[in-house]
Design a protein with these regions (language model features):
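Membrane-embedded alpha-helical bundles that constitute the cytochrome b-like, heme-associated redox core
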Residues: 1-258
Length: 258
């Protein structure tokens, strides 16, 4: 089993990491190309870039937005993403692994902080899962992978914490380490081909929305006409929900379609 573990955190790790990086780079480049193509083909090239930049910053650093809607769920999601980013890159054992593969290293976080972040990430994964299961609106918008991913992403954290902190027999330790290594490799291999690719697309999300709205000539105008906004610009500072008696009635009430 030790040979399988070494293979998983050696050649297989380098392969899946390379696949993840190249795959995410491809997704990022194709998105940029799509934005440029939409902008080139549009007859309306007026885009409020400053507003888009502010909205992008607000989505990347959502501290002030966490309490607006579903505060507990939003805060849980924020903690989950923080743990996913920090622990894999700054846990001391992981820094050593990165050093072996990349040839250089960086400072590691304290062990106690890593343990607490690991536990918070595990708890947040459970919270996100049940937050979808128990919330009717979230269930209506969720796909099967939305329920699958929190569990898969939690496996490396559960097994890693067990290996680092629990006194177990050598056989149990090796089994946990095998699950830890191969679940992480599986995640890296899947990232570019699933919704987790949003980790590199998040900085572009508001730009995509602003530009792609005009991708099909006249599409934005037709949507605005359907909503009764033919006399208003497509992008405005204030949300239109206050003036939309029918289209946004459910949104104002905090309900969702059945």
């Amino acid at each position: 089993m030790e040979a399988w573990i070494e293979f998983g955190r050696g050649p297989l790790f380098r392969l899946t990491f390379s696949l993840m990086v190249l795959g995410l780079l491809r997704v990022f480049i194709l998105t940029i190309v799509g934005i440029a193509e939409a902008y080139r083909r549009s007859s309306d090239r007026i885009v409020p870039w400053k507003q888009v930049a502010r909205q992008t910053a607000g989505w990347l650093f959502p501290i002030g937005r966490l309490w607006r809607k579903r505060a507990v769920y939003s805060s849980t999601s924020f903690l989950f993403h923080a743990g996913l980013l920090l622990v894999p890159f700054f846990l001391a054992a992981h820094v050593l692994l990165w050093s072996r593969s990349l040839g250089f290293a960086w400072p590691a976080m304290p062990r106690r902080l890593a343990d607490w972040l690991t536990l918070l990430t595990i708890g947040a994964a459970l919270g996100l899962f049940f937050g979808r299961v128990l919330h009717r609106c979230a269930r209506a918008l969720s796909r099967p992978q939305d329920y699958f991913w929190p569990w898969l992403l939690a496996i490396p954290f559960v097994t890693g914490y067990a290996c680092a902190n629990l006194a177990v027999r050598p056989e149990a330790y090796q089994t946990s380490m095998l699950l830890h290594v191969y679940s992480a490799d599986l995640i890296m291999a899947m990232v570019p081909f699933t919704k987790i690719a949003h980790c590199v697309l998040a900085p572009l999300s508001q730009t995509v929305t602003a530009v792609s709205w005009k991708f099909v000539p006249g599409a934005g105008d037709r949507v605005a006409a359907t909503l009764g906004y033919t006399d208003r610009p497509i992008w405005i500072e204030k949300a239109r929900s206050d003036a939309a008696p029918a289209a946004f009635a459910d949104a104002r009430k905090g309900t969702c379609p059945k």
